[in-house]
Amino acid sequence: MSFSPQLVNLGNYLAGEFDNREQALGEPIWFVHLRLWQRPVDLFSDDSITLFAEQANIVNLDRPYRQRILRLMPAPDSETGLYVQYYMPKNPSALIGAGRHPDLLKTLTPQQLELLPGCVLSVSQQTVAPNSYQFTASPLPNTCCTFSYLENTVQVSLGFAVTETELHTYDKGIDQETGKATWGAIVGPYRYTKREQY
């Protein structure tokens, strides 16, 4: 299947190695210096572009966390719309370090992933210059992204905005009782700069 230019651009913009060095130096109280890897993987390739993502504190690059899969797809009810479906590895520890060592991803199969039904983002595209775009991903209305991790139920709010060189992430953990953010982009997005294209 051939992919739309919008889907190809979104995949290219999201694929790469990123960090938020400038933000962490400018606002060290609020933002840890992180490295984020988003590697293309050969899954669901008949209708999607799929990425493996994980991140690490810059001082602990050997201890990455938040392993996840982003499946970028055309929206079923739209000729131009896109959306992102999140998955979680059933055994995240088997993929620790795959951002830096992509050979670990070669044997990954769909059967090793858990679909996260409420963890879906709708993507809109805005032209910012000729052949240059910004994609903004927001949760679908009336959805709640929850999943089990280490025998706990976790709720997160997801979202991002990406251009060819920058990625802003709005992911944050939510306390299910109070509805308040407990970790992540509490005072604003993490502002990453792409350092390497994958």
Swiss-Prot record:
Q: Which residues cross the membrane?
A: none
A Pfam family cross-referenced in the UniProt record is CpeT
Q: Which InterPro entries match?
A: CpcT/CpeT, CpcT/CpeT_sf
* Induction data: Induced by nitrogen starvation.
An MF annotation (GO) of this entry = lyase activity
Keywords of this entry: Lyase
User: Of which family is this protein a member?
Assistant: Belongs to the CpcT/CpeT biliprotein lyase family.
Role, per record: Covalently attaches a chromophore to Cys residue(s) of phycobiliproteins. In vitro is not seen to act as a chromophore lyase for ApcA1, ApcA2, ApcB, ApcD, ApcF, CpcB or PecB, the lyase activity is therefore unsure.
- Protein's UniProt name: Phycocyanobilin lyase CpcT homolog
Tell me which species this is from.
Nostoc sp. (strain PCC 7120 / SAG 25.82 / UTEX 2576)
Q: Which gene encodes it?
A: cpcT2
